[in-house]
């Protein structure tokens, strides 16, 4: 007869010996894992090379991560945060179906190249003329699968993904996204405790391109790539990547090469006068090696080579979130973004798998943002916007996959302000508080926000609904709760570590650049 040892037996008994209000039991498909940073990643032009080189940095023994349960703004930029004995940060996982091509594309741009090759091949076959240069051979290595026949060329694979119904998981991934901005040991790090330290890429002084960190669990079964967002003047920061960040923001999220008006210098030559823009020209511009989405291929392929048996996740904030999403769509990897600009526009120009062939709930992409962020909501444009003043053409608003939307304008009474785009603001003032689960809170408040999120974008500065009293909202929605206090007996029983996350929805009926006409004018 098998008799379990003391350690194993204790694991059975601990749940019954703990506090009288234990956390909800996980389902068989749900488990909690911990990570630590193992690498840093980045890319830069080395030795006069024509293409950027991917750089890695293994974790330093002196690398330290910091956590906080108070606003980071309480400290100066150069202040070294103290080591805190905060609760261990956890990520809860679950199983989810993700639709993937049976044959993985070699690169992100393979989708666009395959589409172009097949279109030219089709036109060459059906046009009986001697202009043979219009027809090229179909690529032998990889052909984009047909989304019209998902059963033949696609597989719905059960994958381990972060459980985004769990608030602690949403916060932990947001902190990983925040850590992508700063080098190990810097003042902006959060303590990740049992999480493996990441491998930051591109942190050398001359590394002016894509940056971030790589996290892994103890068994290297799950690896998380975090990618840095924009470091530029519109967000109150800068650094060596600011120039590339601005170029890629304007190329990815503008309607036509950042040609906002006559005073702007376009980032590509696709403008055809009026509100006309060259579609093929735009697609060609996006496959340039200088674009972060393209360089992300090298990063993803290198990580899969280093961890061949691991499940790869991606996360990032702002531009880093959009790049994470584009990589995830290309390779069928789960991605969680924070305050990302609408990346449906560049995804469609790269011919990545999108609805209706790729249902939003099978894409594995989830965007987390709030309604007071003009960048994520797609309203940071026009001559009086801060984005315009800083030279950013942030004109897209539609997101791929599913969206977890926090209606901070209606519920918290926030004004639309580009400063709320910062990841620290999101962690401290949005994610730190539990939002009502289905059936809780003021009736109709959340439903109104979700149903009309894209129509409300143009009037997002509207005052708080008269039917909602601010004090009542604070009581119902738990604003100001920051979790267990450090003093004995100071715990807040109303603060919940798990749950309290809005339900993901797809952004149906969203349209970008409705004034523009795209065709072949160049």
Curated annotation (Swiss-Prot):
Membrane topology qualifier: Single-pass type II membrane protein
Pfam families with a match to the protein in the record: Lipase_3 (PF01764)
GO MF term list: phospholipase activity; triacylglycerol lipase activity
Transmembrane segments: 6-26
GO cellular component, one term: Golgi membrane
EC category name: hydrolase
Region (Disordered): 481-506
Main location: endoplasmic reticulum
EC number: 3.1.1.3
GO biological process: multivesicular body membrane disassembly; neutral lipid catabolic process; pexophagy; phosphatidylserine catabolic process; piecemeal microautophagy of the nucleus; vacuolar protein processing
Positions in the Cytoplasmic compartment: 1-5
Glycosylation site positions: 48, 133, 196, 220, 302, 309, 361
Chain ranges on the Lumenal side, renumbered to this chain: 27-522
Disulphide bond pairs: none
Function: Lipase which is essential for lysis of subvacuolar cytoplasm to vacuole targeted bodies and intravacuolar autophagic bodies. Involved in the lysis of intravacuolar multivesicular body (MVB) vesicles. The intravacuolar membrane disintegration by ATG15 is critical to life span extension.
UniProt family annotation: Belongs to the AB hydrolase superfamily. Lipase family.
Subunit structure as annotated in this protein's UniProt entry: Binds to both phosphatidylinositol (PI) and phosphatidylinositol 3,5-bisphosphate (PIP2).
PANTHER family documented for this protein: LIPASE ATG15-RELATED
Name of this protein: Putative lipase ATG15
UniProt gene name: ATG15
